[in-house]
Amino acid sequence: MRMQETAAPARKESLIYTAAAGEKKTVILPDNTKVMLNSGAKLMLSDDFNETERRVDLDGEAFFDVARNPEKLFIVCCRDNEYIVRGTSFNVSSYVNDRFSIVTL
């Protein structure tokens, strides 16, 4: 019997930004979008962010001031929802223990 090693498919690395409890944190993303994380929030994006689309995952609450780019959508994923914009400002609150996500324009 011969065993052959195969390389695992390349896994996309993620960048993770967090705001500790009692702290707010401002992050500038590679596309110049400004994100203000509320206390306890976590924002994740893959290292290929901004190559074909601008997709982030959010756990918690954050205010987004999205850099306008009509060619690449900006997508916020949280829980079972996706919020898709091209360039605007809005707030998303989506905590794991909450029943609903709340988006405010």
Tell what function each PLM region has.
Residues 13-105:
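Short, small/hydrophobic-biased targeting/export segments
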Residues 1-10:
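Single-pass transmembrane signal-anchor helices and their membrane-water interface zones
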